């Protein structure tokens, strides 16, 4: 059976990290590119993602038709089923379907979820939370987010906002957060 590959992306407010995995879950190649700060457009971020994936394919020496799927984690409220980023405080995405253009470009399935949900799911399946039925994760970076595993299942809530701890308002007169509110936990404790 011929070797096949998956590409995973961590799309953040300051960088896009891409990794190619083979069918044995071994890292074949990794790449990191900076995202521009400030008002970069949705189309520019989309083009950056496409260029990172193309560079990963070329630099790793694999053929594009050997890619099974591309998966990504990104900050914000994301409908995992449709691939629509409803809101991202650290990227210029509002009701933006990133799934369609990536699938069109590469001809393989593209999956996207909230970056912290994806991270907590990874810890649950392969890392520090392996073997636990219920897991709470809190990740701090450019922003701050949480993820929940309840009874062995990722819990996102009915509006994909479960565990958005970073946007709990601690002080209504506090510093302005990237989400537009004042006094969010994220505004006090993240790298934003």
Residue ranges and their predicted role:
Residues 41-50, 58, 65-70, 77-134:
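Glycine-rich phosphate-binding loop and adjoining helix at the ATP-binding site
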Residues 25, 73-74:
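A conserved beta-strand/loop capping segment in the N-terminal third of enzymes
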Residues 10-12, 69, 137-140:
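Short loop/turn motifs at secondary-structure junctions and domain boundaries
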Residues 10-12, 22, 79, 115, ...:
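Acidic active-site catalytic centers that drive phospho-/nucleotidyl reactions
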Residues 2-47, 51, 84-87, 160:
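Short glycine-rich, Thr/Ser-proximal phosphate-binding strand/loop in the N-terminal lobe
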Residues 14, 75-77, 141-143:
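Short glycine-rich anion-binding loops that position phosphate/pyrophosphate groups of nucleotides
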Residues 3-5, 19-21, 29-32, 41-42, ...:
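Glycine/GP-enriched mid-protein hinge/lid loop-to-helix segment characteristic of carbohydrate kinases
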Residues 17, 80-82, 146:
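Glycine/Thr-rich phosphate-binding loops of Rossmann-like dinucleotide-binding domains
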């Amino acid at each position: 059976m011929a070797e096949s590959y998956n590409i995973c992306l961590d799309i953040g407010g300051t960088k896009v990290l891409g990794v190619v995995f083979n069918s044995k879950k071994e890292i074949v190649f990794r790449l990191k590119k900076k995202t521009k700060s400030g008002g970069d457009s949705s189309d520019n971020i989309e083009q950056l993602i496409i260029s990172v994936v193309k560079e990963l394919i070329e630099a790793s020496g694999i053929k594009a038709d050997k890619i099974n799927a591309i998966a990504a984690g990104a900050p914000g409220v994301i409908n995992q089923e449709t691939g629509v980023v409803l809101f991202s405080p650290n990227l210029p995405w509002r009701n933006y379907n990133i799934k369609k253009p990536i699938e069109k470009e590469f001809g393989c399935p593209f999956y996207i979820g909230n970056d912290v949900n994806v991270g907590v799911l990874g810890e649950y399946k392969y890392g520090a939370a392996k073997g636990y039925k219920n897991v709470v994760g809190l990740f701090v970076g450019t922003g701050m987010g949480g993820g929940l595993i309840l009874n062995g299942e990722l819990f996102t809530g009915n509006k994909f906002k479960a565990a958005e701890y970073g946007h709990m308002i601690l002080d209504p007169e506090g510093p302005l957060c990237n989400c537009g509110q004042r006094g969010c936990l994220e505004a006090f404790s993240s790298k934003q």
